[in-house]
Amino acid sequence: MKAIIGKKVGMSQIFDENGHVIPVTVIEAGPCTVVQKKTSEKEGYNAVQLGYEDVAEKKLTKGEMGHLNKAGVSPKKHLREFDLDNAAELNIGDIVKADTFQAGDFVDITGISKGHGYQGVIKRWGAQRTPTSHGGGPVPRHAGSMGSSTDPSRIFKGKIGAGHMGVDQVTVQNLSVVKVDPELNMLVVCGAVPGPKGGLVTIKSTVKVHKVKQAGADISKNPQKASGRNPQKASARNK
């Protein structure tokens, strides 16, 4: 697995070779410093801890500064642990840059979604408005009755309701890397990324294999049709 920490810069759009508009997100990826290296002999598993974004020493706790001073690394604001493929090759103090990814790679990006404050059931969960006529009630955007009467005489757990919306950890999978700029430490990915501008994101190799249809593959057969499942029965039925 390949991984890096970064910040969302914003969204833009590009044109492909066919003239189609593609929405993209620009991410400032790295540089990240290797702060700690974990091994199966000592910790029981192999992993690498990366630090991102320099910060003033006074903004960190003594425990955090002791951890960073032990590694001989300047104060870092964000620390994340990853199970990298080249963990054995990395040493404490090494720099991981945006060029760890290449154009055409597929990645999973995790961030904190935008906060929307206190919202009702319509915006928060996509609930339907109540009827505005025939006794629909005084407030069309309020939730209707959920507790019934004597039985069950309560609201089941997990029912939708008004409340705080956003500021949740969200992962978007299978985004393709369109462009990599090692000099500016920039990644350009196709699609939207959770979070506001300047929000922290982690970029990792996708956990799901992105299947691409091979050229010349026979896509005319529909497995849902009888002819696709059993051609002999279909031919006998058509006689």
Language-model segments: which ranges?
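Extended basic (Lys/Arg/His-rich) segments that typically form rRNA-contacting surfaces
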Residues: 1-239
